[in-house]
Amino acid sequence: MYTGEKIVLRLLKKNKGIEDIFDLGFPKDEEILKKSFDKRNSITVIAAPTGEGKTTTLYSILDYLNRPEINVTTIEDPVEIRVEGINQIEIDENTSFASSLRTVLRQDPDIILVGEIRDLETTEIA
């Protein structure tokens, strides 16, 4: 058995840009996706192992929904892709997902992306 520290390195293509949500391989689910984007007061959870496309999928959805009249905020650790027109909060040693989510809820958000929900407090607020 090995002991000690581990490191994870993620390499993202910097010049790739954000992919169109409908080019990601969900052809049968396109109408379901469009309907889910129109729902108010709902939560969508995307869960998958590392490297399975969660970030690509989430940013594609945000890009699809990103319009000046929609207040979109992300809470991430770290912010992986900077997106014009979206408010992005990066978690650090002085902030948490829960405290940031509480703050964002007071700012009349239309859409909130919470990058991780790993504790009961964040789960209850979401």
Regions from the PLM with identified roles:
Residues 33, 62, 101, 123-126:
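Generic hydrophobic/aromatic pocket-lining and core-packing "Φ" positions
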Residues 75-78, 105-126:
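Conserved P-loop NTPase nucleotide-binding/switch module
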Residues 1-48, 60-73, 84-87, 91:
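P-loop NTP-binding catalytic core
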Residues 61-64, 94, 104-107, 116:
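Amphipathic alpha-helical segments that mediate coupling or scaffolding at interfaces
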Residues 81:
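Flexible, glycine-rich phosphate/dinucleotide-binding loops
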Residues 56-57:
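Conserved Walker
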Residues 88-104:
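Short glycine-rich substrate-engagement loop in P-loop NTPases that contacts/grips substrate
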Residues 53:
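Conserved glycine(s) of the Walker
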